[in-house]
Amino acid sequence: MIRTDAKDGALVLFSGGQDSATCVAWALERYQTVETLGFDYGQRHRVELECREGVREALKHRFPAWSDRLGDDHMIDLSVLGAISDTAMTRTIEIETTANGLPNTFVPGRNLMFMTIAAAIAYRRGLRVLVGGMCETDFSGYPDCRDDTMKALQVALNLGMDTRMVLETPLMWLDKAQTWQLAEQLGGDALVELIRVETHTCYVGERAELHDWGFGCGECPACKLRKRGYEAYLKGERVTEAPL
């Protein structure tokens, strides 16, 4: 049974990808008002931003119970982040592991900036809950995706703004198979299909071929993770019920 907490509105970090789309659905099931926030930081896979409106429209029209809950969308130009980043997410370079053990797809400070800006918007909009798709289970070791980072950031933002916001990360302890299953629990096969076809994950921005698991090059780390998770989800591997 999905829990519903309609007392507060939520602002969801929504890139146009699988994880953040699942988080939008998760928030729509819980809150009366859900707004979305995207960032254009010069990402190599900017096509994800072009998917956002299609996902939002599909959520409105295919899921009547959520239609009135989905509120405004916000898009922030954060090109300064791309300008100061020398990564495979913002440059056309090979994806590889760096000397510090992190992949060069790591954009230093990205989630910290995202959440800080989100908090400022939520403060102005009267929204108490911030929702992000950060995950510490199936991830690339990004330090700004860790649970400890999010908890520390929640404390810092509340101190700095003298407020009581909550940072929700519903995917934090889920693997990709469980993320697919969570989508099924939230919106059935219709939501799984929406996410499969309408969202974008591929780091290199490839959207020419629709695979069983969605669009993508099939070779970058993001595609491999999405593919592996989808196949495990179909087989029912590693998961009995995704925690809600």
Swiss-Prot record:
InterPro entries (UniProt xref): QueC (IPR018317), Rossmann-like_a/b/a_fold (IPR014729)
Binding-site residues for Zn(2+), renumbered to this chain: C202, C217, C220, C223
Annotated SUPFAM superfamilies: Adenine nucleotide alpha hydrolases-like (SSF52402)
Cofactor binding summary note: Binds 1 zinc ion per subunit.
Keyword Ligase carried by entry: yes
Pfam families according to UniProt: QueC
Entry's Gene Ontology BP terms: queuosine biosynthetic process
Zinc is among the record's keywords: yes
Reactions accelerated catalytically: 7-carboxy-7-deazaguanine + NH4(+) + ATP = 7-cyano-7-deazaguanine + ADP + phosphate + H2O + H(+)
Pathway: Purine metabolism; 7-cyano-7-deazaguanine biosynthesis
Residue positions binding ATP: F14, S15, G16, G17, Q18, D19, S20, A21, T22, C23, V24
UniProtKB keywords: ATP-binding, Ligase, Metal-binding, Nucleotide-binding, Queuosine biosynthesis, Zinc
Cofactor(s) the protein requires to work: Zn(2+)
Primary role: Catalyzes the ATP-dependent conversion of 7-carboxy-7-deazaguanine (CDG) to 7-cyano-7-deazaguanine (preQ(0)).
Name of this protein: 7-cyano-7-deazaguanine synthase
Organism field: Burkholderia cenocepacia (strain ATCC BAA-245 / DSM 16553 / LMG 16656 / NCTC 13227 / J2315 / CF5610)
Gene: queC
